[in-house]
UniProtKB/Swiss-Prot annotation:
It is found in: Cytoplasm. The lineage of its organism: Bacteria, Pseudomonadati, Pseudomonadota, Betaproteobacteria, Burkholderiales. The gene is fbp1. This is Fructose-1,6-bisphosphatase class 1. Binds 2 magnesium ions per subunit. GO terms for cellular component: cytosol. It comes from Ralstonia nicotianae (strain ATCC BAA-1114 / GMI1000).
Length: 338
C-alpha cells in the first residue's frame, strides 16, 4: 500500500475536486507543521519543564497552563509570515491578531484553540489543537472583528490534532473527513483513514454526569432514558464515556460513533453554554457533519449560528445523527409544552 503524506493528499484533492487552492494548501501545511512542533513539546512534558500553570489567565478567566502559552506562540509564529493569512484569532487572546505590516497578507482567517483539554496535561490524558479557516470577506482591507463574524457554514477547512498514543491530524476541506498519523521517523503526517463516517446509531454517550442536577429538562430526559437501559423506553443499554477533553471525546466519536454533550446549565443562565463557538464548536461541527453526523445547540444547527462576538459560547450536542436528532426533538417538544 502506497503511503500518502499530507502534501500529496492536498495536491491530489485539488486536482480532483478543485477545492484547495495553493494558498489554502500552504496554510494547512503550516498549521500541520505547527501541530507537529506542539506535539513534540507535549511529548517531552516534565523533561522540558513545560508542565504546570503559567501563572496567568486568559480572556475566558481560565488559568493558563505553560503549554497553553507555548502552543499559542507556536501557531502565531508559524503562520504570521507565510502570506496566506490576513489575521488570526485564538481562544487564549482577547482580540484578534492582524498579520504585521512587514509580512504579506493573504485571503484567509485562521481561528484556533491552541491546546484543548489543557487541564489534563499534567495527568497525561490526550489533548489537542483545534483550528478553523475562513475567507477574509474583503481581502486587502484592514481587518476588523466583524470579518470573523461568519457562521460555520462559511468555513473552508477545519480540523484538529490529537496528542495521544499517536499524534493524529483530522482534516476536512468540505469533501469528507480524513485522518493522518504522524510518522515521527520521517516527520510527516501519513494518510491512515480516508472518508471517516460516524454510524447513525450508537450505544455510547459522553457527558459530565456530575452536572446532571443543573441541566435543562430535555437533556435530563435523554440521559435518564439512556441510563434506564433495556428496561427503559430505548430498549438497549448505553455506556458512558467522559474524558473532559473535547478533542479526545470527539475523536472517539469519529472513530466508533457516539454522542457528545456539553449542554447549557442553570448555574450560568445568562450564558448560552460553556464551549466556544468559533474555536471549538464550529470546527468540530464541520468535521462531524462531513462524517455523516449532526451538531446542534439543542435548538439550532451549530453551523448556522450567526456569531456576535469572537469569544461567544454555545451549548454543544454532536455525534451520531439519530441520537442528536432525538435530543433536538426533546428540546422542541419542551418548547411546545412550555
Amino acid at each position: 500500500m502506497k503511503r500518502i503524506n499530507l502534501t500529496r493528499y492536498l495536491i491530489e484533492e485539488q486536482r480532483e475536486h478543485n477545492t484547495i487552492p495553493a494558498e489554502l494548501r500552504l496554510l494547512l501545511e503550516v498549521v500541520a507543521r505547527a501541530c507537529k512542533a506542539i506535539s513534540h513539546s507535549v511529548n517531552k512534558g516534565a523533561l522540558a519543564g513545560v508542565l504546570g500553570s503559567a501563572g496567568t489567565g486568559n480572556v475566558q478567566g481560565e488559568t493558563q497552563q505553560k503549554l497553553d502559552v507555548i502552543a499559542n506562540e507556536v501557531l502565531l509564529e508559524a503562520n504570521e509570515y507565510g502570506g496566506n493569512l490576513a489575521a488570526m484569532a485564538s481562544e487564549e487572546m482577547e482580540s484578534f491578531y492582524e498579520i504585521p505590516h512587514r509580512y504579506p497578507k493573504g485571503e484567509y482567517l485562521l481561528l484556533f484553540d491552541p491546546l484543548d483539554g489543557s487541564s489534563n496535561i499534567d495527568v497525561n490524558v490526550s489533548i489537542g489543537t483545534i483550528f478553523s479557516v475562513l475567507h477574509m470577506p474583503k481581502p486587502g482591507q484592514t481587518v476588523t472583528e466583524a470579518d470573523f463574524m461568519q457562521p460555520g457554514v462559511r468555513q473552508v477547512a477545519a480540523g484538529y490534532a490529537v496528542y495521544g498514543p499517536q499524534t493524529t491530524l483530522v482534516l476536512t476541506v468540505g469533501n469528507g473527513v480524513h485522518m493522518f498519523t504522524l510518522d515521527r521517523e520521517v516527520g510527516s503526517f501519513i494518510l491512515t483513514n480516508r472518508d471517516v463516517k460516524i454510524p447513525a446509531d450508537t450505544k455510547e454517550f459522553a457527558i459530565n454526569m456530575s452536572n446532571m442536577r443543573h441541566w435543562a429538562p430535555p437533556v435530563r430526559r435523554y440521559i435518564d432514558e439512556c441510563l434506564a437501559g433495556t428496561e427503559g423506553p430505548r430498549g438497549k443499554d448505553f455506556n458512558m464515556r467522559w474524558i473532559a477533553s473535547m478533542v479526545a471525546d470527539v475523536h472517539r466519536i469519529l472513530t466508533r460513533g457516539g454522542i457528545f454533550m456539553y449542554p447549557w446549565d442553570k448555574r450560568e443562565p445568562g450564558k448560552a453554554g460553556k464551549l466556544r463557538l468559533m474555536y471549538e464548536a464550529n470546527p468540530m461541527a464541520f468535521l462531524v457533519e462531513q462524517a455523516g453526523g449532526a451538531a446542534t445547540n439543542g435548538h439550532q444547527r451549530i453551523l448556522e449560528i450567526q456569531p456576535e462576538k469572537l469569544h461567544q459560547r454555545v451549548a454543544v450536542i454532536l455525534g451520531s445523527k439519530n441520537e442528536v436528532d432525538r435530543v433536538t426533538q426533546y428540546h422542541r417538544e419542551a418548547q411546545q409544552t412550555a
